[in-house]
């Protein structure tokens, strides 16, 4: 029985001393059984190193094996000794099973609990409580210890002690149950080491030798095992990163010193050995340096001195090429730089992939980019980041299944369920093929989004019907749509067949056991295990062993969770929400098994994980100020203050894990261990930005090192530039070389420069490569690509649009905004999929229809809206609105309580606007003549004629539309007609937009009205019609400000909010009668006109609202020219990608749904159609000049 320590800082070759000790023991004692104990994290690597060393001591044997030297972790040591004992045959229980035990205990002791009462419903509380109970057990703390703690605390009269006493009261109740319900029935992870401690007390270890390496501290359970080993084993050697032995408590350094943690461990072990009267051997200090380079040796010395706040006595090294700092613009650039350096060092220097170790404080930040990038660079890696099972489709299926039941077939839950691809309908030939299933599901989702099918719609008797509304096939169903209907209903019927019976059975389940059986039967009957087996087999066919193993791991865990649920909660009533939470927590804490696929690969891990320090090169990446040092928080139920109070009541062999403060104090030491992992080179790297991360800064640790050693900062370029002279770092693999070649070639073309010599050489070599020749030529040819659409041939344009273009004026507006977008929408008829929602178009249609019906009903009754009172108006409005929500296009307004509320708001807006017409009528002589006037619509009665233009070459254009309202005024036998256009948002007439074809609607409607006056009115012979103008009416239920009401009557404030805006003819007779209420000089609150002090009427200053007859005619003429110009360009196949860019930087691309298709990029030759900055006067001057020029011709 003896204890020996191997001590030294991290630069020394500790392992060599330990391995030599093995051979010494073997020489001294041929019967020696040697156990090499390392952290579980390092077991595989350590075992390889031990075997390699032992083999090297043999005489040229190709094969080597040994049974007397074993490498274990503490838990694996327990398996080795106890695998055949009764203890080890007891059923294992997962953490999820422990959650279930604690859940039951919380329910059963609800009346006894104080601060934990009702907490089981809080997300994460049960898992947090289980973690705390496990920590108590790992700390060797018993129920009786907790009771003693409570007694001690009750004698302290402080708020902290009182709160902790209450907390321990509840913990004690649950902890007692926790231990009793698992004792002898289950083997918990926290039971393994105590069982080993007990077992070893009766085991003959007189020929056993133990080496313990890789630890800086031990849990109380591990310490208990060591205590037994000290008393029963022949010899125990413990290796610590420590520069001196500490035998007296007074000799312990300050908690902030670098080696404090190791000092404390040494002291505890030393005292433990003395107490047990175990012989303590002289400390052994390795003399051989493991760290080979001066830079790293100096770094170790500096880090010790600076952390211990000692004078810095470190000589600066020359070029420091073995110690470097790299700055990258993004995390992706950072990983690419590392992959490139590794690839080149392996290719050009004497390195293997196994010589590299990559560490980062937070590997989660890189989890989505590491594997793809290293795969691109063909660098084999093992990412030591356990992947959680919570994201597996089986877990998604279970979650969605219970959500579908709880929330009654909601769209989100149904798609989540079906998209797991674990529930597949069966046909007479077997399961539906996955390709067919995906197509059917896509069509089903489209239909659901279009018509809002959810809830009971899934269970209805009648099939869903797929159809599309169109101008030519309204209400009909084509053969294609009939086929889609059948595909969609395959899935709907399948859901209707399997889910309602399952849900009914769950509702009838008497207890948890029955519910678990029902769930398991449902999954098996519907082929979920079969689908998982199919996934495994496909992965095996593709040679992906990692993915092949996962379906079985997940299913096995699910079965284990179900067994544990039945055992622990099966006799209780079944609560679906609690059951699902327990399952999800189980999967959340579960991870997939990971085994390195090859020995020669780069290991990627976190700086906090203990590493074998046998690598030549280490990259510490992601070294930012946010994570190095780490910002540690205590997430356990016992706070740091609680821990300090508790620890004072415990014996030396019982102790909790470190406080957050203690772990923060150990950060320099943990990072020191990471710094010292390599033998030769250490690289630090950090990004300045990441996904949703800006302003990242270098770690203060790295900053200290950089300043101490005057290290230069290497900036990693994500992409090469023409100016880069050193191109080697951009050609790590042929694929990356090609990718970077394309980037440089594109730059060369853009700058009109020749391709640099080195890149021409790379281009030549890639062309000579049989694998990359074709791809290289194809991609290089793409450099000449410009994203310029080709003009369509006239014959193709005619096939798309016909020889006669029957269209609305709004489509021409879209054409002038972007010719290519028009082609995509109306030529190729591309559209976004329909979604069941209340769009602005829907609300606009509701307003238009309601106002149209209101005015038509009044006209039918020969009543003027001006002459009725409020009660009569309300009666008419009720008649008009009644039943509108039953129309197919407005059925969404009945789909939910929210939509019914919106329906009331829509009705209120219609009421406001209708009454505004009444109030306006009190002040103006303008009266509604017709509403919803159609022109150019084939097959409609009483419609007006289309605006028709012959374009030549057999082409013609017919413009159709619908005028919201035509108003009329008759003054002294002079008739004026005007247009009113309803808008859901505020609109003003923009002369520039009208000139460039971006606002054609109002002028086109005015033209259509003027050309159809004979169909609108019974005119007397020679009677002339004057255009009153064209105005917008903003349909709104305005919010009135209090200050406005205080200054003016409420009715006037409302009128101002509903004031017309647009163009009005400069005619004094007309203007003076548009608002007869203006007595003094001032603005009208009905129309955009003003009465001036001299009595004449005109427009509001600089508004352009009032227009002369001649200028109006010029606008109408320009409008007709634009329509013909657009139609000619369309027939000529013009599909230019020329989105308009207004002077205020708005563009036609801003809200376009076709941006992904257009791929607009000014670097690829695309250009905006930039409008000049012009005002109303500029446009009118242009029109006059153009008209004058035409007159002269």
From Swiss-Prot:
Q: Which cofactor does it need?
A: Mg(2+)
What EC numbers are recorded for this enzyme?
A: 3.1.-.-
Alphabetical UniProt keywords: ATP-binding, DNA damage, DNA repair, DNA-binding, Exonuclease, Helicase, Hydrolase, Nuclease, Nucleotide-binding
Q: What class of enzyme is it?
A: hydrolase
Q: Which InterPro entries match?
A: ADDB_N, DNA_helicase_suRexB, P-loop_NTPase, PDDEXK_AddAB-type
Q: Which Gene3D superfamilies match?
A: P-loop containing nucleotide triphosphate hydrolases
Q: Name one GO molecular function term.
A: hydrolase activity, acting on acid anhydrides
The similarity comment for this entry is: Belongs to the helicase family. AddB/RexB type 2 subfamily.
Further remark: Despite having helicase-like domains, this subunit does not have helicase activity.
Alphabetical list of HAMAP family matching this protein: AddB_type2 (MF_01453)
Q: What protein name does the entry list?
A: ATP-dependent helicase/deoxyribonuclease subunit B
Encoding gene per record: rexB
């Amino acid at each position: 029985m003896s204890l020996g320590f191997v001590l030294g800082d991290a630069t020394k070759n500790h392992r060599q001393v330990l391995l030599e000790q093995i051979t010494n023991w073997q020489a001294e004692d041929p019967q020696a059984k040697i156990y090499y104990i390392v952290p579980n994290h390092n077991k595989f690597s350590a075992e390889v190193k031990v075997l390699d060393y032992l083999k090297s001591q043999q005489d040229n044997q190709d094969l080597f094996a040994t049974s007397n030297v074993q490498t274990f972790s503490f838990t694996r040591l327990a398996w080795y000794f106890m695998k055949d004992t009764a203890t080890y045959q007891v059923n294992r229980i997962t953490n999820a099973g422990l959650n279930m035990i604690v859940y039951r205990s919380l329910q059963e002791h609800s009346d006894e609990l104080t601060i934990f009462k009702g907490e089981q419903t809080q997300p994460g509380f049960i898992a947090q409580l289980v973690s705390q109970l496990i920590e108590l057990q790992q700390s060797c703390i018993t129920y009786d210890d907790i009771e003693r703690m409570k007694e001690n605390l009750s004698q302290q009269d402080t708020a902290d002690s009182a709160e902790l006493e209450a907390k321990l009261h509840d913990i004690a109740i649950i902890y007692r149950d926790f231990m009793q319900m698992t004792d002898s029935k289950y083997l918990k992870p926290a039971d393994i080491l105590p069982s080993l401690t007990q077992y070893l007390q009766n085991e003959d270890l007189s020929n056993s030798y133990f080496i313990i390496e890789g630890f800086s501290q031990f849990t109380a359970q591990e310490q208990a095992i060591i205590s037994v080993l000290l008393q029963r084993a022949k010899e125990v050697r413990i290796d610590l990163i420590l520069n001196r032995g500490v035998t007296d408590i007074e000799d312990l350094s300050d908690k902030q010193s670098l080696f404090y943690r190791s000092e404390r461990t040494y002291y505890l072990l030393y005292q433990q050995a003395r107490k047990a009267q175990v012989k303590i051997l002289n400390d052994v200090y390795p003399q051989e340096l493991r760290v080979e380079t001066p830079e790293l040796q100096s770094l170790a010395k500096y880090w010790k001195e600076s952390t211990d706040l000692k004078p810095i006595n470190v000589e600066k090294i020359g070029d420091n090429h073995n110690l470097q700092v790299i700055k990258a613009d993004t995390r992706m650039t950072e990983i690419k730089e590392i992959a490139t350096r590794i690839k080149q060092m392996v290719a050009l220097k004497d390195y293997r992939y196994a010589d590299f170790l990559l560490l980062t404080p937070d590997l989660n930040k890189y989890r989505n980019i590491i594997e793809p990038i290293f795969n691109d660079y063909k660098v084999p890696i093992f990412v030591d980041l356990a992947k959680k099972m919570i994201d597996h489709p089986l877990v998604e299926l279970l979650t969605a299944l219970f959500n579908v039941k709880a929330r009654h077939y909601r769209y989100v839950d149904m798609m989540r369920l079906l998209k797991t691809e674990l529930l597949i309908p069966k046909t007479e030939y077997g399961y539906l093929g996955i390709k067919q299933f995906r197509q059917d599901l896509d069509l089903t989702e489209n239909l659901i989004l279009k018509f809002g099918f959810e809830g009971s719609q899934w269970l209805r008797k009648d099939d869903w019907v797929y159809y599309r509304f169109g101008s030519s096939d309204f209400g009909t169903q084509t053969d294609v749509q009939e086929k889609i209907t059948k595909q969609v209903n395959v899935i709907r019927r399948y859901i209707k067949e399997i889910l309602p019976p399952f849900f009914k059975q769950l509702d009838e389940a008497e207890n948890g056991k029955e519910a678990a059986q029902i769930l398991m039967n449902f999954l098996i009957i519907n082929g979920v295990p079969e689908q998982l087996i199919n996934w495994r087999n496909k992965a095996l066919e593709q040679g992906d062993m990692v993915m092949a193993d996962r379906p079985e791991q997940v299913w096995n865990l699910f079965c284990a969770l179900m067994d544990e649920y039945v055992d622990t909660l099966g006799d209780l009533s079944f609560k679906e929400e609690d059951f699902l939470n327990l399952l999800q927590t189980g999967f959340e804490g579960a991870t997939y098994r990971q085994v390195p696929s090859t020995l020669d690969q780069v290991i990627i891990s976190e700086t906090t994980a203990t590493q074998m320090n046998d690598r030549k090169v280490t990259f510490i990446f992601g070294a930012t100020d946010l994570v190095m040092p780490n910002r540690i928080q205590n997430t356990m139920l016992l706070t740091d203050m609680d821990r300090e109070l508790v620890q004072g009541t415990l014996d030396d062999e019982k102790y909790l894990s470190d406080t957050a403060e203690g772990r923060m104090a150990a950060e320099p030491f943990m990072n020191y261990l990471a710094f010292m992992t390599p033998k030769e080179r250490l690289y630090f790297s950090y990004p300045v930005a990441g996904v949703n991360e800006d302003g990242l800064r270098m770690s203060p640790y790295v900053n200290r090192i950089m300043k101490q050693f005057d290290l230069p900062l290497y900036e990693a370029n994500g992409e090469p530039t023409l100016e880069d002279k050193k191109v080697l770092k951009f050609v790590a693999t042929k694929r990356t070389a090609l990718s970077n070649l394309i980037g440089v070639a594109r730059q060369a073309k853009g700058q009109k420069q020749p391709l640099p010599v080195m890149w021409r050489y790379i281009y030549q070599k890639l062309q000579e490569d049989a694998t990359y020749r074709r791809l290289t030529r194809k991609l290089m040819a793409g450099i000449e690509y410009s994203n310029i659409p080709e003009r369509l041939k006239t014959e193709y344009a005619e096939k798309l649009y016909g020889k006669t273009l029957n269209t609305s004026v709004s489509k021409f507006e879209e054409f002038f905004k972007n010719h290519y977008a028009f082609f995509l929408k109306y030529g190729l008829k591309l559209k976004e999929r329909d979604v069941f929602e209340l769009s602005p178009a829907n609300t606009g249609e509701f307003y238009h229809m309601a106002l149209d019906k209101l005015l038509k009903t009044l006209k039918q009754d020969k009543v003027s809206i001006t002459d009725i009172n409020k009660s009569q108006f309300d009666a008419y409005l009720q008649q008009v609105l009644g039943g509108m929500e039953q129309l197919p296009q407005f059925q969404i307004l009945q789909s939910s309580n929210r939509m019914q509320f919106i329906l009331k708001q829509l009705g209120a807006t219609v009421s406001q606007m209708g009454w505004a017409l009444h109030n306006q009528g009190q002040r103006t002589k303008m009266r509604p003549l017709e509403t919803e006037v159609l022109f150019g619509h084939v097959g409609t009665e009483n419609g007006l004629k289309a605006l028709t233009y012959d374009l030549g070459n057999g082409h013609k254009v017919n413009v159709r539309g619908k005028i919201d309202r035509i108003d009329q005024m008759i003054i002294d036998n002079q008739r004026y007609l005007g247009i009113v256009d309803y808008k859901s948002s505020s609109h003003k007439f923009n002369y520039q937009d009208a000139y460039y074809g971006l606002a054609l609607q109002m002028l086109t409607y005015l033209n259509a009205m003027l050309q159809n006056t004979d169909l609108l009115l019974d005119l007397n012979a020679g009677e002339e019609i004057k255009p009153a103008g064209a105005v917008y009416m903003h349909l709104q239920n305005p919010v009135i400000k209090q200050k406005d009401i205080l200054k003016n009557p409420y009715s006037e404030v409302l009128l101002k909010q509903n004031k017309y805006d647009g163009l009005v003819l400069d005619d004094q007779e007309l203007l003076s009668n548009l608002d007869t209420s203006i007595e003094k000089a001032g603005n009208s609150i009905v129309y955009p006109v003003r009465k001036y002090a001299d009595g004449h009427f005109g427009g509001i200053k600089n508004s352009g609202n009032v227009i002369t007859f001649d200028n109006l005619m010029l606008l109408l003429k320009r409008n007709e020219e634009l329509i013909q110009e657009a139609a000619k360009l369309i027939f000529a196949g013009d599909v230019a990608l020329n989105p308009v860019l207004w002077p205020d930087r708005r563009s036609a691309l801003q809200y376009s749904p076709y941006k992904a298709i257009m791929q607009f990029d000014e670097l690829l030759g695309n250009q905006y159609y930039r409008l000049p900055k012009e005002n109303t006067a500029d446009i009118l001057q242009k029109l006059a000049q153009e008209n004058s020029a035409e007159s002269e011709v």
